[in-house]
């Protein structure tokens, strides 16, 4: 390496010893013993080192696979309640990755089947959050798909193969990583066929999509264009083995409780032996979901072959007010903690009183949106405060109580100088 220098009227002009650019062509030139390096070359060196570290990094040891109890404990940190669903998911996920670690066949020649998962639960009960948390914990690629946007190949809409393409995008088209990933397909109940009798008319977004998903979920080698490019037919397609990908399908299945109730009621007998229940003894939706059988899903509109590809079923219960209050306060990424962290960046403390949390939960219950509606309620309550706070001087604390949630008063602003204490804009 030689140090290129050139004398000028104002002194020596310095050059990067690696790329040859002058000090005027770069933002920073770092000096060493008889050599110089510019900021651009430093960035390039860092990129090279990062790539080499990736290549020599030891692959995840199979023994690092967390046990079902460890998976459940991790889910508890982020998802409130749904204990049965967590246990079912923990066992299914553990068995899936154990199968990948040891191969599809045991030493005795027993073939291990693939156990995809069906989540049944009301809107906002935590189906998506459970799937996301699992993927984050296991450090595997994760993608979501909306079943309502999927259509059969050849029709306007999103092809089923696009799901795998999205998964590849999440891991920079690394096929090996994608094959260890998790795919969550939401609103799966929306692709039920319109009746339980096969129709001669084309059901583009119903039974047809179920048929298209069959092979993908069960396991096939999907051909996906690199970078999603169909514009260049000469490019070689990437081959992805979907038998190694864990598929989790979720849906609210509105009306399924009626199907289950009808079956249960039919099986209880008639006349003197009938199981007569009073209004107070009527089963809740959550109770009925726990009794779901494959035949109920068939009657709902899922084809038997599709149900067979989702052998593990986990039902989630409707969240009550107490659970919603816990969701606001307890998880690692609880909403109150998130907004407190946002205001902390302005050096302002945020306090939610207990009665405020109950009021937020009550509003969410009235909207029938479960935990999903909590953020919009909190966002609306704090909108004006977050708008004005960056321009305000001397505010040290914001207090939210029940009256603020109900729109009866403004958030209480506490100033460093208590004499300037004010409520809202007053």
UniProtKB/Swiss-Prot annotation:
Q: What positions does the entry give for ATP binding?
A: 122-129
Keywords in alphabetical order: ATP-binding, Chaperone, Metal-binding, Nucleotide-binding, Zinc
UniProt cross-references to Pfam families, sorted A to Z: AAA_2, ClpB_D2-small, zf-C4_ClpX
**Classification via InterPro entries:** AAA+_ATPase (IPR003593), ATP-dep_Clp_protease_ClpX (IPR050052), ATPase_AAA_core (IPR003959), Clp_ATPase_C (IPR019489), Clp_protease_ATP-bd_su_ClpX (IPR004487), ClpX_bact (IPR046425), P-loop_NTPase (IPR027417), Znf_CppX_C4 (IPR010603)
Q: Which GO terms describe its biological process?
A: cell division; proteolysis involved in protein catabolic process
Where does the chain bind Zn(2+)?
16, 19, 38, 41
Could you tell me which residue ranges the ClpX-type ZB domain spans?
4-57
| One annotated Gene Ontology cellular component of this protein | HslUV protease complex
Per UniProt, what is one GO molecular function of this protein?
ATP binding
Tell me the superkingdom of the source.
Bacteria
Functional description taken from the UniProt entry: ATP-dependent specificity component of the Clp protease. It directs the protease to specific substrates. Can perform chaperone functions in the absence of ClpP.
Q: Describe its partners and assembly state.
A: Component of the ClpX-ClpP complex. Forms a hexameric ring that, in the presence of ATP, binds to fourteen ClpP subunits assembled into a disk-like structure with a central cavity, resembling the structure of eukaryotic proteasomes.
Q: What family is this?
A: Belongs to the ClpX chaperone family.
| UniProt-recorded name of the protein | ATP-dependent Clp protease ATP-binding subunit ClpX
């Amino acid at each position: 390496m030689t140090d290129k220098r050139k004398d000028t009227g104002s002194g020596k002009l310095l050059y990067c010893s690696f790329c040859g650019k002058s000090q005027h062509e770069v933002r920073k030139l770092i000096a060493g013993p008889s050599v110089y390096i510019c900021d651009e070359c430093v960035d390039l060196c860092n990129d090279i080192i990062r790539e080499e570290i990736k290549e020599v990094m030891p692959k995840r040891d199979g023994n690092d696979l967390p046990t079902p109890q460890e998976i459940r404990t991790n889910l508890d940190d982020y998802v409130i309640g749904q204990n049965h669903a967590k246990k079912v998911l923990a066992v299914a996920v553990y068995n899936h990755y154990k199968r990948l670690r040891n191969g599809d066949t045991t030493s005795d020649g027993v073939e291990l089947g693939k156990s995809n998962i069906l989540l049944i639960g009301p809107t906002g009960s935590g189906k998506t959050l459970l799937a996301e948390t699992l993927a984050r914990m296991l450090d595997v690629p994760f993608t979501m798909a909306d079943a309502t946007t999927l259509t059969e190949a050849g029709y306007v809409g999103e092809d089923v193969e696009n799901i795998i393409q999205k998964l590849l995008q999440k891991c920079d088209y690394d096929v090996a990583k994608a094959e260890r990933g998790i795919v969550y397909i939401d609103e799966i109940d929306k692709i039920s066929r319109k009746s339980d009798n096969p129709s001669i008319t084309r059901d583009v977004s119903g039974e047809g999509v179920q048929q298209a998903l069959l092979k993908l979920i069960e396991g096939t080698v999907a051909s996906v264009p690199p970078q999603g490019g169909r514009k260049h037919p000469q490019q070689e397609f990437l081959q992805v083995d979907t038998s190694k990908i864990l598929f989790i399908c979720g849906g609210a299945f509105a009306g399924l409780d009626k199907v289950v109730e009808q079956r249960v009621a039919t099986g209880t007998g008639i006349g003197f032996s009938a199981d007569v229940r009073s209004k107070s003894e009527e089963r809740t939706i959550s109770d009925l979901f726990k009794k779901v059988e494959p035949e109920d899903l068939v009657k709902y509109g899922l084809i038997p072959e599709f149900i067979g590809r989702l052998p593990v079923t986990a039902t989630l219960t409707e969240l009550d007010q107490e659970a919603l209050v816990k969701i606001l306060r307890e998880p690692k990424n609880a909403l109150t903690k998130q907004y407190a962290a946002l205001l902390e960046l302005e050096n302002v403390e945020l306090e939610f009183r207990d009665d405020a949390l109950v009021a937020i939960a009550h509003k969410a219950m009235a909207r029938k949106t479960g935990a999903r509606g909590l953020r919009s309620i909190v966002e609306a309550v704090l909108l004006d405060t977050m708008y004005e706070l960056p321009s305000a001087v001397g505010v040290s604390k914001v207090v939210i109580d029940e009256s603020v949630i109900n729109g009866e008063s403004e958030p209480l602003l506490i100033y460093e100088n208590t004499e300037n204490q004010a409520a809202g804009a007053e």
